[in-house]
């Protein structure tokens, strides 16, 4: 056990985490040179295309140092803000972490957030300055930033280039010297932390565990503590980047994959504790909460007959991603679908893309919303996440909305842009400090509803991509809010309703109807598009009707004949307008997301 090192890599997006993992794997000789490919740890196509890590992967490496063989377990963590729950699980199964910072970019908002999780878990942190071969690299400045913003001593920081492999050997030696070996009791009853789980078509649900005390053997009966269910261990494997390697036992301090032959992942929830069924441990490993959805949106199949396929697809994705929550809902405009809870915007995009890609579905997503707490006039309290379920205004005594604490790091020349943008979104400044002469850290309390739409994109475009952003949910605060409905041809389209601050309802409504006017296809009758709050119409646009030339078949002839046909057409249009239905294209539902 003294020769085991469990560590993970903490980094902001694009600071070179997956490349560094590739280099460590290569240096330890775990993968032959001919099998080596970029982003070896990122297994999903979406991960490779977007260059992000979503699922935490792990790999077991062997390394020789001063004549002894060591086992290094590298636990990869996602860097994006939505997946911080994956980070907290991965970090809880390590003793140390490499803090990777780009030598040209410096400290970013996400880096700070993840370092705090690591410090909470009392990990030994090794600062690593990556990309030092870039012309713009400034390792001294970056070390000062780390010391100033995080308070870590950087005198022993390592300089590496993951791309060229510079300094990788020294890094491995340092990992063995500075990261402590696991401390667990080998003779105690089995106690293991499940820090990831996924579904394999042949083996069923698999749990990736870190054994804290005791060991897990093939054939042993284990108990999952939160569900109280017992399962038999069918197989055990060590994770390896190309194919897992079978083993008979996973010992104290090691990580491994446990095969239980289960049909679904909900029985082995991430963050749960596994123990021996005959002699269970007294208490579970603490510090884990089930992932809470942060953003909700409706997902509907474009072809309503495929509702059951969507249900199956969501069930299968849930096997891999225990954080998705969903329940069926119906919409007048879109038919049958599901209300799905996500961890954040990127998570929502990734899930939608995976549903469309892996299950070949065409989906419409409604505008994302958050959970509101309402106190009604009769004193009762309710929570609402779908705007169309909001009770009438006269029944609501007060309405509270969730807030987040956002940390934004931005170059000082864009400071004005960012402050203007955040205050337009009802942000309240809590703190502002200069990291160095060119970069500023801002801390704001912002209503969650204001950041779920396109806050991140707007922040990036307003700062030429230089700002970084991270958030954590804080509390509910009272807000003066109203439901904005969109009516097309007199009918409310429930899927387009959004909840907005009252003082902004007019401009939001106006922007929405203008956007919709461009999108709604012209009909044979004119279509009114209106925005309303309660029963009051606050904005309107009209889509003009298409003229059909009914007099085309009259060659010459009497004017009264033509007039008769035109009158008849007018009557028909009137009737059509009264009963006509307007088919809304997919873009109409996205228009809600685009208004600022």
Swiss-Prot record:
InterPro entries, sorted: EF-4 (IPR006297), EFG_III/V (IPR035647), EFG_V-like (IPR000640), EFTu-like_2 (IPR004161), G_TR_CS (IPR031157), LepA_C_sf (IPR038363), LepA_CTD (IPR013842), LepA_IV (IPR035654)
Recorded superkingdom: Bacteria
UniProt keyword annotations, A-Z: Cell inner membrane, Cell membrane, GTP-binding, Hydrolase, Membrane, Nucleotide-binding, Protein biosynthesis
One GO cellular component term: plasma membrane
Record SMART domains: EFG_C
Catalytic reaction annotation: GTP + H2O = GDP + phosphate + H(+)
Coiled coil: none
Binding-site positions, GTP: 14-19, 130-133
Record has Signal as a keyword: no
One of the GO biological process terms: positive regulation of translation
CDD domains, per the entry: EF4_II, EF4_III, LepA, lepA_C
UniProt-listed PANTHER family: TRANSLATION FACTOR GUF1 HOMOLOG, CHLOROPLASTIC, TRANSLATION FACTOR GUF1-RELATED
UniProt similarity note: Belongs to the TRAFAC class translation factor GTPase superfamily. Classic translation factor GTPase family. LepA subfamily.
Record function comment: Required for accurate and efficient protein synthesis under certain stress conditions. May act as a fidelity factor of the translation reaction, by catalyzing a one-codon backward translocation of tRNAs on improperly translocated ribosomes. Back-translocation proceeds from a post-translocation (POST) complex to a pre-translocation (PRE) complex, thus giving elongation factor G a second chance to translocate the tRNAs correctly. Binds to ribosomes in a GTP-dependent manner.
Protein name: Elongation factor 4
